[in-house]
Design a protein with these regions (language model features):
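Short alpha-helical transmembrane segments in multi-pass integral membrane proteins
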Residues: 1-14, 68-133, 177, 183-247, ...
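N-terminal transmembrane alpha-helices
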Residues: 2-30, 34-35, 51-63, 67, ...
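Transmembrane helical elements of multi-pass membrane transporters/channels
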Residues: 9-28, 129, 140, 163, ...
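Helix-terminus/linker motif at the lipid-water interface of multi-pass membrane proteins
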Residues: 19, 23-41, 110-117, 173-194, ...
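Alpha-helical transmembrane segments and their lipid-water interface positions
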Residues: 21, 25-28, 32, 54-61, ...
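Interfacial/gating helices of multi-pass transporter permease domains
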Residues: 32-51, 83, 117-122, 196-197, ...
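Small-residue-rich hydrophobic transmembrane alpha-helices
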Residues: 40-100, 137-156, 265, 278-342, ...
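Short runs within selected transmembrane alpha-helices of multi-pass transporters and secretion channels
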Residues: 61, 130-149, 156-167, 199-214, ...
């Protein structure tokens, strides 16, 4: 049986990587937050395009990771190479589409979330500038996930560290500019302040650095996934159809879930600019601790998938139950830590006191369901998918969101005119119901399938 030491050996670099990625988003929000509520709203809504794209890429790549983890358990390197090639192709196709959309029709995208012309204008400037980063993100994300699925978790973390440093330095320079005082006492502009556009340019350069490190050093160190490009396209009769059968539900799952989360921003945007600014602050701060749960969930997927690939099915069932319980307990503690963070919001975000008050309420409500969110993530991403149970994961993960939570929330805003906290309560019905369904499925053991057989 895999012990806690082995779990955290894999989880810690992933946690670090995910934490730093969240920190970059928070850093963007904090720095742009010095410019005002409109700028926070513009960047937050602009990033909804990336959020939806990210989840589609995550879905396609996660589907491939199911195969790679199980192939890794079998030491089937040809299967690993073939799957990695498909992951790269699909990831590039998705990110290319979103690059074109963000470059050509950014205003149309933003009107889905806000009617404020100032927010739309600044958000469009941000999207046009940040769009080139999507392709580099797609390449590095797919290849880094292939590396992690073969238990090479350190290099992706190092790449993210370097990316964060580049992003932080360029953010400061390009958002605020650089001025020096001349001998006559007048300010001389060395580098112009670009505001939200500067934040986007910094993101582009940081993504380029990340992609270069993930690829170059994998080949230098001769990782299992770092092979000649021709080996990525070795054909095996029936494999592509099997890949599609497993991955399409994951891709649909992540796409619908991402659009649903994005719709939450649209719901609050219809309540006013201050409400959406508060909701963006809540999302940024609560997501800062989420990488710990996500890292443990990703490690669970690797370990459970590898154990299934080794043919140890009973051990995989027991492992899945133990790890879900552990991660839920960790998240319970982390959720409690969100509450004192409400006291430091006024010192971090230079926005109106009403926005801070609303963000604090959002955070306290989020803390109440943090452990449920974590269990749902671990069961869906870490267990059901690694066991090839992607159709049930799809139905559980997005069914309640689209059938219950989103319709209730829209009615609460547009028809019943509920206050912001009551609207959020409608959204938070979802994780409670989802956790009940996930627990029943986990205990049944019906989620376990060896997708590499045959």
């Amino acid at each position: 049986m895999i012990n806690a030491t082995q779990l955290f050996k894999i989880a810690l670099p992933i946690i670090l990587q995910n934490f730093l990625s969240s920190f970059v988003n928070m850093l963007d929000t904090i720095m742009v937050g010095q410019l005002g509520s409109v700028d926070i709203a513009a960047v937050g809504l602009g990033n909804q395009v990336f959020f939806v794209m990210n989840l589609m890429v995550f879905g396609a790549v996660s589907g491939g990771s199911i195969f790679i983890s199980q192939f890794w358990g079998k030491k089937d390197f040809e299967g690993i190479h073939r799957t990695s090639g498909i992951m790269l192709c699909v990831s590039v196709a998705i990110t290319l589409f979103f690059t074109i959309v963000a470059s050509v029709i950014p205003e149309y995208c933003l009107r889905l979330y806000s009617k404020d012309p100032d927010v739309i204008k600044k958000g469009a400037d941000y999207l046009r500038a940040v769009a080139p980063s999507y392709l580099f993100f797609g390449l590095s994300f797919a290849f880094a996930n292939a590396e992690r699925s073969t238990e090479h978790v350190t290099l992706p973390a190092i790449a993210t560290i370097c990316s964060v440093i580049v992003n932080a330095v360029l953010n400061y320079i390009l958002i605020f500019g650089i001025k020096v005082t001349g001998a006559d006492g007048n300010s001389i502009v060395i580098i112009k302040a670009y505001g939200v556009t500067g934040a986007a340019i910094a993101t582009v350069f940081s993504r380029i650095v990340e992609a270069l490190i993930v690829f170059v050093f994998a080949y230098v160190r001769k990782y299992e996934v770092a092979v000649a490009p021709s080996k990525f396209f070795i054909k095996q009769p029936g494999f592509l159809s099997k890949y599609v059968k497993i991955c399409i539900p994951v891709l649909i799952n992540e796409s619908l879930w991402g659009i649903g989360i994005s719709m939450q921003s649209s719901i609050f945007a219809h309540s006013g600019t201050d409400v959406i600014a508060a909701f963006n602050i809540n999302s940024t701060v609560s997501n800062l601790l989420w990488p710990i749960c996500l890292g443990c969930g990703s490690a669970t997927a690797i370990l459970v998938g590898k154990t299934i690939g080794q043919g140890k099915y009973k051990e995989a069932e027991k492992l899945a139950k133990n790890l879900c319980a552990l991660i839920t307990l960790i998240a319970l503690v982390l959720g409690l830590l969100l509450i004192p963070l409400t006291k430091v919001l006024p010192f971090i975000f230079k926005v109106e006191s009403e926005v801070i008050a609303m963000a604090s309420v959002f955070l306290i409500m989020k803390a109440a369901v943090y452990s449920l969110d974590s269990f749902n993530m671990c069961s869906v991403v870490g267990v059901f998918r690694s066991g090839g149970d992607t159709i049930f994961a799809l139905l559980m993960d997005v069914g309640l969101m689209w059938v219950v939570a989103l319709p209730l929330s829209w009615l609460a805003v547009l028809v019943w005119h509920f206050p912001y906290w009551a609207v959020y309560a409608c959204i938070l019905i979802e994780p409670l119901c989802k956790a009940v369904l996930g627990f029943i499925r986990l205990m049944s053991g019906k989620w376990l399938h060896d997708v590499t057989e045959g």
